[in-house]
């Protein structure tokens, strides 16, 4: 089984290149918003950008919007789940690995969650029983995407440094 920590240590392409945005209402879509890669075929450049870039608010005092249940996204979740990408235009999150290496979509919205459908149920993001972030980290689809990311990044490193 692949270790995320090992992948991040071994691969330069797993490091994040922070970008900033000054506001949440993004029009046109912010350059670091993962929604721009949604439901389309990705070039190598797009795939690398999706894997490496995270949206970063322009201010440390930025307050993420609350949902209908008075809950909000927490930037600290990205410390444990390095694959997590916040979309300011959707106020939801995506998995950079699964989005970069989409296998196929499904009629089941839970299957597409974090990939083509943003995850927004902040109440269930963490927790032993219903923690969707931890559950997503361990599903077969995510583990396959993690493996593809490792091979892809190794290939990128080998071809860029012969």
Predicted regions and their residues:
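N-terminal leader/early-domain signal
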Residues: 1-162
